[in-house]
A protein has these predicted regions:
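A short acidic-Thr-Gly-centered motif at the start of a beta-strand
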Residues: 23-32, 63, 88-95, 159-162, ...
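Active-site-proximal beta-strand elements of phosphoester/diester hydrolases
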Residues: 35-43, 166-172, 330-332
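Divalent metal-coordination and catalytic microenvironments
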Residues: 41, 75, 104-105, 154, ...
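Residue-level marker for buried hydrophobic side chains located in beta-strands
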Residues: 38, 70-72, 101-102, 167, ...
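Active-site neighborhood of divalent metal-dependent phosphoester bond hydrolases
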Residues: 67, 80-225
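Acidic, His/Gly-rich catalytic cores of divalent-metal-dependent hydrolytic chemistry
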Residues: 187-381
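Active-site environment of divalent metal-dependent phosphoester hydrolases
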Residues: 45-46, 78-81, 106-112, 161, ...
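N-terminal active-site segment of His-dependent metallophosphoesterases
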Residues: 3-88
Length: 381
């Protein structure tokens, strides 16, 4: 079955900063009722998405014969071959009421105008690395006339979806951030992010951290500029990083919370002084949480680790495992975002996968058709 995409200019748009956009949904919104299929981080892997939808029983318009509906956990786009096709398909499915989609950190990076090589398919389509022979020559670039619609769509996405039996978020169920968003109304993700950024930067300036951070960056400029620099742990830079993460509700829900690193490490083109806080180890609520973001492995035998940042989970955890003291948190990101690395090595048999968690069945389905009965610490309907 062919699942195709086409632009959907007929969506109902309003105006925001001169950009046509869909109306804003609440930041904390109600999840679909009934049976749903929660799809992990797609990262521009359109063929994997197409294969997974077939395995789940959806037609090319996102309809299911049993009335099931889709929820995308975020990170639609990245270094996969066809981020535009993924975004277009999801936009259409959301507009038709057949899917919901959360904001992921990769969509947030595009919204706030970050300049990273992994975003060049969108921010700099003419870059040499996107041309034949370049590092990202495999990536289809965004059609220029669709940029505004993509940004508008990302700006309108909820950050949290919830219902009585389930919570959905891209990276972290962080109560302080969620409470703040409940009170925020519907200003849009970019406006929320910018307001938090302005408040945080003012506080850092007042505390003198901004000046100390600048001094550390200047003193260690050569070490910070590339992945081989091995800078020391810089206290002002670390504190600034933590505040920009933990005090910004949009960021902490899409990137996950940070804590002070034991030593600096280099990932996503920069040195980090903070590392991931394993928040799931302290989650004691009864309501299950499904998230993405954390580059989980599907295979656990030696030599099958997906290329990624430092591992977030016990590397021996298999795909059936739930996390947390009550075993009621599930990460549905099975590292398909690293498939571009596998291709660069000439691999055609992939160890990274795109998965979906079927709710309430608690079954994992991956794009190859493998079905895994997961093992939650609760009884699901």
């Amino acid at each position: 079955m062919a699942i195709r995409w086409t632009p959907h200019p007929s969506l109902a748009f309003t105006e925001f900063r001169g950009i046509a956009m869909t109306g804003f949904a609440p930041c904390v919104a109600a999840a679909f009722d009934g049976p749903i299929d929660i799809i992990g981080d797609v990262h521009g892997e359109y063929d994997a998405l197409r294969a997974l939808l077939v395995q789940l029983g959806y037609d090319d318009e996102g309809r299911h014969p049993e009335g099931r509906r889709l929820v995308f956990i975020g990170d639609l786009c990245d270094r996969g071959p066809d981020s535009p096709a993924v975004v277009e398909w999801v936009m259409a499915a959301v507009a038709a009421g057949r899917a919901q989609c959360l904001l992921g950190n990769h969509e947030l990076l595009l919204l706030v105008g970050e300049s990273r090589e992994s975003l060049r398919w969108f921010i700099d389509p003419s870059h040499a690395e996107l041309q034949p022979g370049g590092k990202y020559a495999h990536c289809r670039v965004v059609p220029p006339e669709r940029k505004a619609a993509y940004l508008a769509f990302f700006d309108s996405l909820p950050l949290v979806l919830e219902r009585p039996d389930l919570r959905l978020v891209h990276a972290a169920w962080w109560p302080a951030a969620i409470d703040a968003l409940r009170a925020a109304g519907t200003p849009g993700n970019l406006a929320l992010y910018e307001a938090a950024t302005q408040r945080i930067e003012t506080q850092l300036e007042v505390r003198g951290i901004t000046q100390r951070e600048a001094e550390e960056r200047s003193e260690h400029a050569d070490q910070l500029k590339d992945g081989q620099g091995n800078p020391p742990l810089l206290p002002a830079l670390a504190e600034a990083n933590l505040r920009r993460n933990l005090d910004n509700a949009v960021r902490v829900l899409t990137f996950g919370p940070d804590c002070l690193a034991t030593r600096p490490y280099y990932v996503m083109e920069r040195w980090r002084m903070a590392e991931r806080d394993r928040w799931w180890e302290r989650y004691t609520d009864d309501v299950p949480v499904v998230m993405g973001h954390y580059w989980r492995k599907f295979e656990t035998s030696p030599g099958t680790a997906a290329p990624s940042m430092p591992p977030s989970f016990d590397p021996t955890l298999g795909p059936s495992a739930w996390l947390g003291p009550k075993r009621n948190i599930y990460c549905v990101d099975f590292s398909v975002g690293a498939r571009f690395v596998e291709r660069s090595r000439g691999q055609t048999q992939f160890r990274t996968h795109l998965g979906a968690l079927r709710w309430p069945e608690c079954q994992l389905v991956i794009e190859t058709g493998v079905v895994v009965a997961t093992e939650p610490g609760f009884v699901s309907g």
